[in-house]
Swiss-Prot record:
Major localization class: membrane
The protein, known as: Uncharacterized protein YGR168C
Cellular localization per UniProt: Membrane
Transmembrane segments: 153-173, 188-208
Keyword Transmembrane tagged: yes
GO biological process: regulation of peroxisome organization
Organism for this UniProt entry: Saccharomyces cerevisiae (strain ATCC 204508 / S288c)
Length: 376
């Protein structure tokens, strides 16, 4: 006859239940609620992340491959990272002996990066790197020193144009021929297509900035016009604060000035402007000449970097021709370089170098540097 072994598993389960009961008795109602919230967060994070991996696993099954442990580990690793970022930071904040936010955030980032394997795309790191450096440059001592020197606006814009010419040469040498920045700068396009594309971009950006001003800036329509400037009457545009201050020799001239003021106030108001005035004041019309200038410059860049002329021109000659084109289309140095496009091409260039030297530890170092830079 077989002798039954003592039920050790049953005793272990009962002992585990007793431990849980004692822990629950030690915790008050407030701590229980916090524990329930933490468990819900953990469940949500793992569940939401599981939805994205289920599609990958289904595709693998359709291809006739079996799901292995190596396929499940990325889901567990990434979910654990999200849980740490979601829970560990508020938990550390409650410890009285750790009152430094820098220590809290650095410890979380360090733990999270140790669990990762550098699977973050390089273009995301390039984006955060350029944005972090740009935000720090705004408050840097060198920037403050340049502002105190009171350089003229034309000098600063000319310096920007020189940097753009040098950056275009570097981008041509380093960018992938199939990438979007390369096609934007160097691909062949007719003049009209270039013009309407650039004008459309200017119009969209202008509408975007106007929408932001409408929702995030205070002010009434009585003291601001469409462009956000103070409404001034016709006399103020002519350099006189009030039309009553004009040296009027005839009383009829005063009535003329009053009439001109009325016409001017009606013209700047969109509600009373006719179709012709709205077209004249539209963003498309206002951006006509700036778009024309940038189109000429873009066509010049395409001409300089065409395959047939690549060997005939050196980089110095290309840079000189681009600077001369800037001087031709903008003799008064008023063509400002948009920070949006400057950052876009900077991110593209950084992404090229990240792809070239990309590996797990290098990505971790950059991520850790970005997190440190963001809280300094």
């Amino acid at each position: 006859m077989k002798h039954n072994r003592p039920n050790g598993t049953g005793k272990a389960v009962s002992g585990f239940k007793q431990i849980i009961r004692r822990l629950l008795l030690l915790l008050n109602k407030k701590r229980r609620k916090q524990l329930v919230i933490i468990l819900k967060r953990i469940t949500q994070v793992y569940g939401i992340n599981l939805v994205f991996y289920v599609k990958k696993w289904k595709l693998k099954k359709l291809q006739g491959e079996n799901i292995q442990i190596n396929d499940i580990m990325p889901w567990l690793r990434e979910s654990t990272i999200l849980v740490l970022l979601n829970i560990l930071y508020p938990t550390l904040m409650k410890f009285p002996f750790l009152k430094n936010h820098y220590i809290h955030w650095s410890s979380i980032v360090g733990i999270s990066l140790m669990l990762t394997k550098g699977e973050v795309p390089s273009w995301i790191i390039a984006h955060f790197l350029v944005e972090a450096i740009a935000s720090k440059l705004k408050i840097a001592k060198l920037t403050q020193w340049l502002k105190k020197k009171n350089f003229s606006q034309g000098t600063l814009i000319k310096f920007q144009q020189i940097l753009v010419c040098l950056a275009i040469i570097v981008l041509f040498a380093k960018l992938d021929r199939s990438s979007l920045p390369f096609r934007v700068l160097f691909d062949h396009r007719p003049f009209l297509i270039d013009f309407f594309t650039i004008n459309a971009i200017f119009t969209v950006l202008a509408v975007y900035h106007r929408t932001l001003k409408f929702f995030f800036t205070s002010g009434t329509k009585s003291n601001k016009n469409v462009g956000g400037h103070e409404v001034r009457n016709f006399s103020q545009y002519l350099g006189v604060k009030n039309h009553n201050d004009w040296p009027i020799s005839s009383s009829n001239l005063k009535h003329v000035m009053d009439r001109l003021n009325e016409i001017h106030e009606v013209t700047i108001d969109d509600n009373y402007a006719n179709i012709n005035e709205k077209i004249i004041n539209s963003y498309f019309t206002k951006g006509f000449f700036p778009s024309l200038k940038w189109t000429i410059l873009r066509q010049c860049i395409e001409y300089l970097f065409v395959t047939k002329r690549r060997r005939l021109m050196g980089n110095k000659l290309r840079c000189i021709v681009m600077l001369l084109t800037f001087t031709f289309v903008d003799p008064t140095s008023k063509m400002k370089i948009s920070p949006f496009f400057a950052k876009f091409f900077a991110k593209s260039l950084v992404n090229v170098y990240l792809k070239k030297y990309w590996h797990c530890n290098f990505g971790k170092y950059i991520l850790f540097f970005l997190f440190q830079l963001s809280i300094m």
